[in-house]
Swiss-Prot record:
One Pfam family, short name: SmpB
Keyword check for Transmembrane: no
Entry keywords, A to Z: Cytoplasm, RNA-binding
Regions annotated as coiled coil: none
Family in the record: Belongs to the SmpB family.
Full protein name: SsrA-binding protein
NCBIfam families (alphabetical): PRK05422.1, smpB
Amino acid sequence: MTKKKAYKPGSATIAQNKRARHEYFIEEEFEAGLALQGWEVKSLRAGKANLSDSYVTFMNGEAYLFGATITPLNVASSHVVCDPIRTRKLLLNKRELESLFGRVSREGYTVVALSMYWKNAWSKVKIGVAKGKKDHDKRDDIKEREWKLDKARIMKNANR
């Protein structure tokens, strides 16, 4: 018989980029690993990450996460220089890199970070291939969300 995995309290999600889903149509999602330094892992365990303005850039055939902020802890070692907004290398397969690079360069898409989470002991980033929304698309999304809430409220009162 296999042993049950120990329950870990709390959520595996470190940070989410809610603004990305509002600003872009997400076409496809990928999971990527992150090349981190020791102080960054400590900060992520404390939940001190922000993905609000982050996106993926391509340099020398590799993908980098740009604009993600990981705030250093006060108790982190003093001999290490902590740069909270440094670009971090994304760990992707060659096939995934080529697919992302091709879509960004040819079809006018952009790649944004959607969320950061723990998968076992590894920190992962969910990135999405996205196309920008126009203002009227954003307004339509807001109207649809409000109608969903109103509909739920009406149905709740109708069952009484």
